[in-house]
Each structure stands twice: as structure tokens, then as C-alpha cells.
């Protein structure tokens, strides 16, 4: 199945977070946090402006980003893999 995001929506795949502490202890449960980094796998056509024009998104497929995981971030399973659907406004930075 293929997802094609609309407007200013971005689809990304969460990057795995290190599950060991600096001292080598395996983190589980509440100590193991979910990563807020992800790789962009699809982008919408752009943000629709009030005058009817479309502003292109700043992120592109392949970018690794840091995002704000909060209200408005939708998690979906597609072909057995978790993907996140969010607005470009929820992206805080591009990792270069």
C-alpha cells in the first residue's frame, strides 16, 4: 500500500533509539523513550495559502528530521511498519 500525503502533511518513519545507557545497561519500559527523529518518506504538495497559491515544503524525501510528537501526530501501520503522519509545522529541525 502506498500513502500520498496531502497539502502540508509529511510521512516519516521513526528512527530507532539506542536502548542501552552509556554504561551499557539495557533500558526498558519507561526508561526507554521513543525517538523523536525520523526519516521523511513522503511529502505533500505544499501549504495552501490564503490567496490560493501553494507554498512548497522545506523538507524533502530522504531528510532526517527532529519532530514534536504531540497532538496532531498520527501513527499508522502500513504493510506491517509504523509510519507517522504529521504537519510540517510539527517538524522542529532537519538533521544535516
Curated annotation (Swiss-Prot):
Q: Under the GO molecular function aspect, what terms does this record hold?
A: ATP binding; metal ion binding; protein folding chaperone; protein-folding chaperone binding; unfolded protein binding
The record, for SUPFAM superfamilies, names: GroES-like
SMART domains per UniProt? Cpn10 (SM00883)
What's a single GO BP term from this record? chaperone cofactor-dependent protein refolding
InterPro entries for this protein: Chaperonin_GroES, Chaperonin_GroES_sf, Chaprnonin_Cpn10_CS, GroES-like_sf
Q: Which Pfam families match?
A: Cpn10
* GO CC, alphabetical: cytoplasm
Localisation per UniProt entry = Cytoplasm
PROSITE patterns attached to this UniProt entry:
CHAPERONINS_CPN10
Q: Which UniProt keywords apply?
A: Chaperone, Cytoplasm
Superkingdom per UniProt: Bacteria
Q: How does it assemble?
A: Heptamer of 7 subunits arranged in a ring. Interacts with the chaperonin GroEL.
* Role played: Together with the chaperonin GroEL, plays an essential role in assisting protein folding. The GroEL-GroES system forms a nano-cage that allows encapsulation of the non-native substrate proteins and provides a physical environment optimized to promote and accelerate protein folding. GroES binds to the apical surface of the GroEL ring, thereby capping the opening of the GroEL channel.
What the entry lists under NCBIfam families is as follows:
PRK00364.1-1
Q: Which family does the record assign?
A: Belongs to the GroES chaperonin family.
Q: State what protein this is by name.
A: Co-chaperonin GroES
Taxonomic classification, please? Bacteria, Pseudomonadati, Pseudomonadota, Gammaproteobacteria, Pasteurellales
Amino acid at each position: 500500500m502506498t500513502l500520498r500525503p496531502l497539502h502540508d502533511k509529511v510521512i516519516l518513519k521513526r528512527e530507532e533509539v539506542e536502548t542501552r545507557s552509556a554504561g551499557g545497561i539495557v533500558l526498558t519500559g519507561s526508561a526507554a523513550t521513543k525517538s523523536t527523529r525520523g526519516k521523511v518518506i513522503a511529502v505533500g504538495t505544499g501549504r495552501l495559502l490564503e490567496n490560493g497559491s501553494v507554498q512548497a515544503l522545506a523538507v524533502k524525501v530522504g531528510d532526517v528530521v527532529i519532530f514534536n510528537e504531540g497532538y496532531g501526530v498520527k501513527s499508522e501501520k502500513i504493510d506491517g511498519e509504523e509510519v507517522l503522519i504529521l504537519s510540517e509545522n510539527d517538524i522542529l529541525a532537519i538533521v544535516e
